[in-house]
Amino acid sequence: MDTNISDEALKHQFKQIQTFVAGTTASTAHVVPISAKLKYNIDVVIQLLSHIPQPKRDLLSPPRCIVFKSIESNINSVIDNNNNVNCVIASAMLIKGVINLGQVIEVKPGVITKTQSNEIKVTPIYTHVIALHSEDNALLYAVPGGLVRIALRTEQTLMKAEKLNGRVIGVPGKLPDVVVKIVVRCCLLKRLMNVKRKDGDESVGEVKLHEMLLVNVNACSVGGKVVEINGEHNNEVMFELNSPICCEIREKVAVSRKIGKNVRLIGFGEVISTVTIDDSDI
């Protein structure tokens, strides 16, 4: 709330906020009136932020990283030495575990190809970590909390720029399966966000059979065709994915639909079952 308004308007905004968050996890949250220009109550906001508890980090499980962005590079741009080694730098979020310098890791799904019979084949990539950075700090190991840059030594033809986006990095044999279909228990939004239609209709509308939607799992965005709709409330949707992804049960999912020229969020959910690629295909 900003206090550069009248007292009556301030009280009205406060009531609007209370109504908006009623029945949610934010219903008991603090509402602090501030003035960024006059710096009123900024100290109160900082004090409240300092009392937010630190999340518990899982340091004992095998490490798992989700890649948000990847670029090709030369090792000289990562660490200061005379080695002329090509590498791929992955900007990733470490979800759990500890990843160490020099550790052997696996990248899933890895290289995705199609056979002559149009069947999908996935080949995981095995490599090792040659550098770790957090901002400008070189690391010997990385723990969960914030982004980390991981330099991987491998052939750049296998992992060209941006091709690692949405991939999962971890200990060989400890990563989730590669899946081609997922069943998501969906919860659709009550109305579209930031969408104005000429007819004034802001409803999301039901998910339709054979509809193409955009599915976001972790940092991976992939098209998904609706092939089945089940459940007591028709909220269990099976998506046939355009490209294999690496995920497991209970992963959080965002579902979007193309509306006009833009893609808009229409719902969210979690994975309740998957269809994996056989081990013989990997």
Give residue ranges: language-model regions.
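Conserved C-terminal guanine-recognition region of P-loop GTPase G domains, centered on the G4
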Residues: M1-T28
